């Protein structure tokens, strides 16, 4: 009798877990700020344009969480299987979306970085 209950309990657990997962959940991609000129910082912008409002700035070596969405329809998931040098070539002149905490106060938001200054981590 107990053995018959295990599949039912397992099915109920899977259903409950799936129901609580966030809709549109995504995997973040870790990329590192690199090749920014000495004494300079990489700006995170509100929109994907150099004239857009600056949200924050990060020095070389900072690892940022990218959402995977880039301008031009490129998704980082689509290039995840490539070697790092090919990933960098694919995004070199694109803006990609980041998830960051610009004020270090727990209020996370999205912003955009120019990928010329980023490398896979």
Spans of features found by a protein language model:
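Short, structured beta-strand/loop micro-motifs enriched in basic residues and often containing a Trp
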Residues: 39-49
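Boundary regions of SH3-family modules and the immediately adjacent low-complexity/disordered segments
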Residues: 26-31, 47, 53, 82-121
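Sec/Tat signal peptide C-region and signal peptidase I cleavage site
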Residues: 19-26
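Bacterial N-terminal signal peptides that target proteins for export
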Residues: 1-9
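Bacterial N-terminal signal peptides
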Residues: 9-17
